[in-house]
Curated annotation (Swiss-Prot):
Biological-process GO terms, alphabetical: coenzyme A biosynthetic process; phosphorylation
Naturally occurring in which organism (per UniProt): Homo sapiens (Human)
Modulation of this protein's activity: Subject to allosteric regulation, exists in two distinct conformational states, a catalytically incompetent (or open) conformation stabilized by the binding of acetyl(acyl)-CoA, and a catalytically competent (or closed) conformation stabilized by ATP-binding. Inhibited by acetyl-CoA and its thioesters which act as allosteric inhibitors and compete with the ATP-binding site. Inhibited by sulfonylureas and thiazolidinediones. Activated by oleoylethanolamide, palmitoyl-carnitine and oleoyl-carnitine.
Functional pathway: Cofactor biosynthesis; coenzyme A biosynthesis; CoA from (R)-pantothenate: step 1/5
Assembly mode: Homodimer.
Name this protein carries in UniProt: Pantothenate kinase 3
């Protein structure tokens, strides 16, 4: 995908996606700076570049996902590396204060942002950091960022992948998928909630539907049920649990399969259905509850996605969003569910930069405001 470079914005180049739970930041680090440019570069710009590229953690909660860095790409006619940084939305005031401390506002830079937080925190950027946000539509940014990242390739690796043999856990393996001809595509964006888009071309897409039961629901319920303190802790607990201790299965009701309607005995008939029994509540572990929560949320997303794919007549479904970060368990569940219930007609696809497409899409909007 070619990005116009007629109008080059002044450095630094950022794109922000301020979500309900996480802030995602894409930062372009130029590597083709001339001696003349370096001489003229103001101290505050050097300070920001050095701070962002020489650290992998910022404060107690900010993290640069080093493994996702895109090296030596060309953007707006400049060569550089693209960095990906995330931190909790509740820590955004600290980020704004850091920008103020590093004299960010003196650089006359353009700050493009998307996500609900671009509206919610606009006043804070202005009053605390003396910064003006240019707000961009989050679904536009999601689609543009996704198509751009897939087009530049992941340092020679495939950006897109799927799970082969999804129905056989011992043979299931991650495999690259060629997305050179991406249309049509159903994009399922799983953040705090879920949005589902039907993409027919780079300019022709629509939001089909969504659900409030997303990553925020998983972490919220897990925190209530298990006392976990973080997404990573919730996933760790889920990986050790058995959801069938909490869920009521078809076989618990029918004694086996419900053959007339093609329902296998292992299918979930009622999520958390076993928790109506006192003895079951007393024997279930926190790990079981975490696993059941993950399975409940993931199965619901998969079910809604499958219905949308059938209605829109699209057979490739790409799942993105930070709910899938370090969450191979859910990815394999989604891959299996789509393959099984569609009788092999639907393919679940995933992307390495799962949660950063909105931030990249915002970055791509820079020339429009320079």
């Amino acid at each position: 995908m070619k990005i116009k470079d007629a109008k080059k914005p002044s450095f630094p180049w950022f794109g922000m996606d301020i979500g309900g739970t996480l802030v995602k930041l894409s930062y372009f680090e130029p590597i083709d700076i001339t001696a003349e440019e370096e001489q003229e570069e103001v101290e505050s710009l050097k300070s920001i570049r050095k701070y962002l590229t020489s650290n992998v953690a910022y404060g107690s909660t900010g993290i640069r996902d080093v493994h996702l860095e895109l090296k030596d790409l060309t953007l707006f006619g400049r060569r550089g590396n693209l960095h990906f940084i995330r931190f909790p939305t509740q820590d955004l005031p600290t980020f704004i204060q850091m920008g103020r401390d590093k004299n960010f506002s003196t650089l006359q830079t353009v700050l493009c942002a998307t996500g609900g937080g671009a509206y919610k925190f606009e006043k804070d950027f202005r009053t605390i950091g003396n910064l003006h946000l240019h707000k961009l539509d989050e679904l536009d940014c999601l689609v543009k960022g996704l198509l751009y990242i897939d087009s530049v390739s992941f340092n020679g690796q495939a950006e897109c992948y799927y799970f082969a043999n999804a129905s056989e856990p011992e043979r299931c393996q991650k495999m690259p998928f060629n997305l050179d001809d991406p249309y049509p595509l159903l994009v399922v964006n799983i953040g705090s909630g879920v949005s589902i888009l039907a993409v027919h071309s780079k300019d022709n897409y629509k939001r089909v539907t969504g659900t409030s039961l997303g990553g925020g629901t998983f972490l919220g319920l897990c925190s209530l049920l298990t006392g976990c303190e973080s997404f990573e802790e919730a996933l760790e607990m889920a990986s050790k649990g058995d959801s069938t201790q909490a869920d009521k299965l078809v076989r618990d009701i029918y004694g086996g399969d419900y053959e007339r309607f093609g329902l296998p005995g292992w299918a979930v008939a009622s999520s958390f259905g076993n928790m109506i029994y006192k003895e079951k509540r007393e024997s279930v572990s926190k790990e079981d509850l975490a696993r059941a929560t993950l399975v409940t949320i993931t199965n619901n997303i998969g079910s809604v996605a499958r219905m949308c794919a059938v209605n829109e007549k699209i057979n490739r479904v790409v799942f993105v969003g930070n709910f899938l970060r370090v969450n191979t368990l859910s990815m394999k569940l989604l891959a299996y569910a789509l393959d099984y219930w569609s009788k092999g007609q639907l393919k679940a696809l995933f992307l390495e930069h799962e949660g950063y497409f909105g931030a990249v899409g915002a970055l791509l909007g820079l020339p429009n405001f320079s």
